[in-house]
Amino acid sequence: MTDLHPLLSRLAAVPGMDAGAPRLVLLFSQLGDFDSLEYAQALVPVLPQLDRVGIQVLAIAIGDGDGADRFCAFTGFPRERLQVEADASLHRALGCSPGLQLPGGPWPALFLMCAGIGSPGTLAEVVRGYTGDRRAPQCFDDEAVVETGVLPAFPAALFQRAGGHRFQRPFELATVRLRNMNEVLRHWRTYVPSDRFITQRGGTFLLAADDSPLYIHRDRGILGFSATMHRPLAFLDPWLQADAAA
C-alpha cells in the first residue's frame, strides 16, 4: 500500500487542501507532456461541478513558473490550482512510474515509449485518436472552427460528415493532440526546462476528508492518464452525477 505521507505533508502547506474536505490531486508529468495537457483540458469543464460538491482540486506538475503560466493560458486550467516541481521527487515518492529507463538517456527512451515499448496502451490510444470511439463524447462542438496551428482552420462540422455526432469521430481526438503537440513544440523550453524527466509518468489521487484514499491511478505509459481513456473522468461519476441531480 502506498505511503501517502509525502503527499499529505505537501497538501498541509497549501491553503484549502488540508484534511477536512475531499481533495483531488493530479500529479501531472512534465507540463509539456501530452497527458498533462489532455488531462487538464478534460478537467476544466467540470471544475465548477467539483466546486459545488466540495472537492478541492490541485495539480502538481514538473516544470517552472513560466511553463505553468503558459500551460494555464493554453488549457484554461486555473493558475492558482497548479503548482510546479523542479524534479520528479514527489512523483517517485508516491510510486509513479519513471517511465522507460535506458543507458542512452531520456530521449531514446521517450521515442521507444511513443512506439509503445515500455509504455503499455500507448499505441492503442494513438490509434483510437484516428479511428474514433463511439463510447467517448465528441471533442468539438459542431459550430466551432478548429485551429491547430498546423493545418488551415476548418469547421468542426466536417467531423460530423466523417462519422456523425454525439460521439468521438474519426480523426477528432488526433486533431486535439495535433494542436497540443504544435503548442508544446513551438514553446518546448518553456514547457520543459529540463529533459531529465520527459519519461516520468504521473498519477491521480482522490482523497476523502479524513485523508483516506478514495481513488488512486498511476499512469503506466504515455496517453495513459486514466484507466478509462474514452471517459477519463469516469472515476468522478458519483460526485458529478450527484451535482447534476441536485
Which positions does each model-derived feature cover?
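Short acidic, S/G/P-rich loop/turn micro-motifs used as interaction or catalytic elements
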Residues: 30-34, 65, 221-222
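Thiol/selenol-based redox catalytic cores and closely related redox-interacting motifs
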Residues: 85-221
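A short, polar/charged loop-to-alpha-helix boundary motif
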Residues: 220-241
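Short acidic-hydrophobic, aromatic-tinged amphipathic segments that line or gate anion-handling sites
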Residues: 8, 80-85
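Short active-site neighborhood of thiol/selenol oxidoreductases, capturing the structured segment around
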Residues: 15-50, 56-57
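Structural microenvironment flanking redox-active thiols in thiol-disulfide oxidoreductases
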Residues: 39-74, 90
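Residues lining hydrophobic/aromatic ligand-binding pockets adjacent to catalytic sites
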Residues: 55, 200-201, 230
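A short beta-strand-turn-helix
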Residues: 1-23
